[in-house]
């Protein structure tokens, strides 16, 4: 079925910033998609087009991206009469029309909005659930429910506290199914709230952009200690492991790292990549840390390679790879990490997201699907993670509706699959392994 009409508009994300929403019409109805936006963005990401008109929304308006859809992309898609099931053809057409390496003409936010809406329409056109359509596009015969990685303590660029490292996550790998993983996550979260309240006072339980708590602590180890205590109090020590997103590019300073980067600058406290690696190794030794994302700066390739070779855990590339095939290929060759973080808006289309995922999986890497800190109520990534069988997703704490929207959609998918539902569990790094 071909596209009858495409209409884009400015809506608001969970931080009150404008973002792009796209309505796509076929004879089967209306399909709507909204685009997320990140706070700590890698310098190699596809370009998110903002208006930069300081008199409006602090320069963060997206009226230009919206206009590119309504005036240029929409007429082209309608006139070409392409079937909405032809995801790759449609994405390719938009990328060719844009003609730039990083989608800077139309904006990745424009192309992605249309791409997501096309994918939703394609599923209905085929008469299958979205996750099944995505699995078909990726060439997967089965679908898998992921382990959720709940970001329950926020630091870094996501929070106003002194904590340098951005995310402290709990992964309920010992759960029997996704519903139980949600219950464990929620119970640990509520226990954590009480632990923080008792230790630091009620105002320390205010939440950050992704629904996690942001107590004003400086020591990253203290974040891990709080998690360990909460997991124990909830009674899940044997079922929950810990993941971190350090987002080290945010505190990289001339070849070294500043673990107190939110205070006035003082080069005497900077530490070397080796010292930082030793700190991570002490975390791995003392706590059930099984995954660390962006442990070093996006261009500190040597430090990545050294750490991945010796750490023995999942090392996730986000700012390092930005889901870009060239960066992934380099990271594969240099053995810089062993897991890809997949954010659809880093690369800017469904087709390229699928390709990045397949490239990583083909090289024996894990893949973690991810939200952005500026989110909407759109639930596309819930279906994406199931269809791509990556086995792991991070989409915030079990708090704030834009985060729960994704987790609740995963609950619905598990229910719909019934006895056919498979949960990644402890095999979250390679859920398709026989």
From Swiss-Prot:
Its cofactor is Mg(2+). GO terms for cellular component: phosphopyruvate hydratase complex; plasma membrane. Residues 405-434 are annotated as: Required for interaction with PLG. Pathway: Carbohydrate degradation; glycolysis; pyruvate from D-glyceraldehyde 3-phosphate: step 4/5. Binds two Mg(2+) per subunit. Required for catalysis and for stabilizing the dimer. Its EC number is 4.2.1.11. It is an enzyme of class 4 (lyase). The modification N-acetylserine is found at residue 2. There is a cross-link at residue 202 (Glycyl lysine isopeptide (Lys-Gly) (interchain with G-Cter in SUMO2)). Mg(2+) 1 binds at residue 40. The modification N6-malonyllysine is found at residues 233, 420. It is found in: Cytoplasm; Cell membrane. The active site is at 210 (proton donor), 343 (proton acceptor). GO terms for molecular function: magnesium ion binding; phosphopyruvate hydratase activity. One of its GO terms (biological process) is canonical glycolysis. HAMAP family: Enolase. Mammalian enolase is composed of 3 isozyme subunits, alpha, beta and gamma, which can form homodimers or heterodimers which are cell-type and development-specific. ENO1 interacts with PLG in the neuronal plasma membrane and promotes its activation. The C-terminal lysine is required for this binding. Interacts with ENO4 and PGAM2. Interacts with CMTM6. This is Alpha-enolase. It comes from Macaca fascicularis.
